[in-house]
Structure formats: C-alpha cells, structure tokens
A protein has these predicted regions:
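Asp-box/BNR beta-propeller blade signature and adjacent active/binding-site loops
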Residues: 1-169
C-alpha cells in the first residue's frame, strides 16, 4: 500500500507504530473481491510486528491510517470493487487491532483510486485531518483537498486543486 506509517501520540497506545497494508489471498477473484485491508503494528520500535484484523470490505485496499481524537485510529480505503464510488472508513479504539463504525463516506467521492489522509494539526481538542483524492465518480479527475475538524465526520473545507475537463489529455 502506498502511504506512510503513523505513530500514536497519546492514549493507551502512545508510541505504537501502525502501518496500513492490504493483501489478496488465493486465486484472483472477480472484481478484486480477494483484496483485504488491514495493518501491521509494533510496540517495540520494529523488533516485533503484529497484524491487525481485516477491515470488513471485500475489495478494500490502498488504505491510509491516521490518529484521531481519544487515541483512536481511522482507516480510509479504496473500494476496488467500485460498486460504491466513495471512500470507505473504519475506526479502531484498540490501537488498530480491530475495526468498528465501518461505512462508506459518501462525502468523499472516489473513482477507485489511491487517496491520502494525514493529521495536520489540532483544533478544540480534536485532530484536524486533510484528505486528498480524485473526487470524481467516473474518472481520475478533480483533485480535491478536504479538511475535517471533527475526526472526519464532516469535510466542510474543500479546495479543488486541479481539474482536467479537456478530454484530450
């Protein structure tokens, strides 16, 4: 999975390093249903690693992780099946071991493409998140940066970075 690792800054899992990952198992399946999103984590600076549970989305891959408030972790992933043209999110309250509140975020349209998620600061006790992707449901277009000040519940700030409406490129 392209992306970055996250080191927890507070809470019970402070210091834990979490690396978002994905895998496929067995023979390739129709619509990439063999893809699964998960992660690896270490509590001893890389001497040993453990693998998390899979996110409950067949075809989930290219996920990104970031710490949100109360020491929780958010995964934001690509839906390789493409049946829902939006990003999929999952939350963890146990340091990235297991997942809850798993759902499509229809406020984050996606054409089945890698996206990026980072924590870029803090505001009123919550992490400020930045999410960037091709915010289009049919093609890799409309590169958009979105900002959330409430742990990714809402993305009120949206900046169109680039749009190619010329179909010849």
């Amino acid at each position: 999975t392209p992306g970055h690792a996250v080191q927890f800054e507070k809470g019970k899992y402070k210091g834990r390093i979490y690396i978002a990952a994905n895998h496929s198992a067995g023979d390739p399946q129709k619509e990439s249903m063999d893809y699964k999103a998960h992660g690896f984590y270490t509590d001893d600076h890389g001497k040993t690693f453990h693998i998390s549970n899979n996110v409950n989305l067949e075809g989930g891959n290219e996920n990104m992780a970031t710490e949100i408030s109360k020491g929780r972790l958010m995964l934001n992933l690509r839906n390789q099946q493409g049946h829902t043209k939006a990003r999929y999110t999952a939350l963890s309250s146990d340091g990235g071991v297991s997942w809850h509140n798993q759902q499509f975020d229809n406020n984050l349209p996606d054409p089945v493409c890698q996206g990026s998620l980072l924590t870029i600061g803090k505001s009123r006790g919550k992490n400020v998140l930045a999410f960037c992707n091709a915010a289009d449901t049919s093609q890799r277009n409309h590169l958009t940066l979105r900002i959330s000040r409430d742990d990714g519940k809402n993305w009120k700030k949206s900046i169109l970075v680039y749009s190619n409406n010329d179909k010849q490129d």
